[in-house]
């Protein structure tokens, strides 16, 4: 990750652009189980890795972050073209998703949608425990920071990237 970060010279991006990239990446990871389920609803084939990554990111932006549909589709298709991926397939899937995006916002993964290694580790959970786990797993986390001294607090205020009016990345 560090090598890719340096290779693409992301340090040259301004604070707003870095915050945007972090926001999309973090939310794409947060909503991965949701976007997998959504993608499965709209395609019979299993896209290759790069196509899946582009689609997961685009679905997150369209359905959960409420970015402009046309902007997300256009930029995703352009990246797909540069990577020589099936841009027509990506375009078609994203256009279908845009039509249904309001109802897709309520798509929620089931316990069985979690990774196999996790299902094996939790096979002894009771049905109500699994239901509670899923209900709580996808809630937006609270973050409580404790600073040891005033200098750390001041450093924090100076070295963060706002992602919204309520949150930021360090």
Q: Which residues fall in each region the model found?
A:
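Class I Rossmann-like S-adenosyl-L-methionine
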Residues: 1-170
